[in-house]
Amino acid sequence: MSVIRLHQYQVVGRALPTEKDEQPKIYRMKLWATNEVLAKSKFWYYLRRQKKVKKSNGQMLAINEIFEKNPTTIKNFGIWLRYQSRTGYHNMYKEYRDTTLNGAVEQMYTEMASRHRVRFPCIQIIKTATVPASLCKRESTKQFHNSKIKFPLVFRKVRPPTRKLKTTFKANKPNLFM
C-alpha cells in the first residue's frame, strides 16, 4: 500500500497593490498538499476561481505548515467536501477516527478513490472539525466508542513450543480453521 503523506498548510496571499487599490484584501486558506509547491499551486487555483486573482498579478505573503496539537490521542473528525464526478458536483459529509487530521484527510482521499473513483484534484475540502462522540452520525465511527470493544483472533496459527520441534517440511497441511 502506498502512503500519500499529506501535510496541512496555511497559505496567505493577495493581489499586487496598484494605484487603484493600494491595500488589496488579504486571503488566508488552509489546504492539504504533499509539499509547499503544490500548496501554493492549489492556493492560486482556488483564488483564481473565487476572487479573480491570478498568480501573475498576485503576491504570496506566507506559507506555514500546521501541526497537530495532540498527535497521540484518537479523535473523531468530520470532513465536509465537494467533489466532481462523471455526473456533476456533489456535496458530502464523512467521519473518520484518527490521531491526526492529516491522517483523517488521507483516509478520506483513499476512500473516495476506492468507493467513488474520485481522484485528488476533483475533491475540494470545504470544512473539517473535531466531532465529539455524542454528535457522531456514521455507524463506522460509532462502533469504536464502546469501551468494552473486543477484537477476536481469527487467524490462529499454532506454533511449536521449542525450536527443536520446528520442521521445514510438514506431512500434512495445517488446519487454520477455528
Curated annotation (Swiss-Prot):
Pfam families cross-referenced by the UniProt entry: Ribosomal_L18A
Family annotation (Gene3D superfamilies): 3.10.20.10
The keyword Ribosomal protein is assigned to this record: yes
Any one GO cellular component localisation term in the record: nucleus
Keyword Methyltransferase: no
Any GO BP: translation
One of the record's GO molecular function terms: structural constituent of ribosome
Domain of life: Eukaryota
Record SUPFAM superfamilies: RplX-like
Keywords of this entry: Ribonucleoprotein, Ribosomal protein
Family recorded in the similarity comment: Belongs to the eukaryotic ribosomal protein eL20 family.
PANTHER family, per the entry: 60S RIBOSOMAL PROTEIN L18A
The protein's name: Large ribosomal subunit protein eL20w
Taxon lineage: Eukaryota, Viridiplantae, Streptophyta, Embryophyta, Tracheophyta
Gene: RPL18AD
